[in-house]
Amino acid sequence: MNGPQRSLPSFTGLQVVHDARLGFSILIPDGWQRLDVSDSSADFYAPDPADLLTGLAVEGRDLGTEVQPGDLATLRRGFLRGLRELAGSKVESREAEAVGRLISLEARHTFRDGDVIRKRWVRLLYQGRAQVRLIAQAATVEQFDYWEPMFYTAIRTAHFGTFT
């Protein structure tokens, strides 16, 4: 083996977070702190409450109008346009699909925040009038790579409904 191998974070468990109003659920790594985000209705879950640049933001809202699978192309264009508005944004990967009434958009991208390059994974879920926005971000690209297994579990378990 060449060089030291960096360990990855280890799971001690997962906690279920359910939004009864909009009907979505997500699994958050056990031990992550829920923090209030000023000027936002999002919940922010951080592995270290002293590092507000690393963690997962979860926000659901009622759009007031039904989103249909036929809206996918329009949503995708607006989503990518929004990502590209960030300074130095580079989209690394993107996906968009409609399955039944569910629409899912996601992208991984880097952007410049002052002198620092940050990395995010954004996923939007739409069903009916509900939108769920998930943003996994780390203070640096290297920290994102470290926390990615935890981000993956949270982002991929988000769904409309409950865990049974």
Language-model regions: role of each:
Residues 1-11, 34-133:
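Conserved polar/disulfide-associated segments of primarily extracytoplasmic proteins
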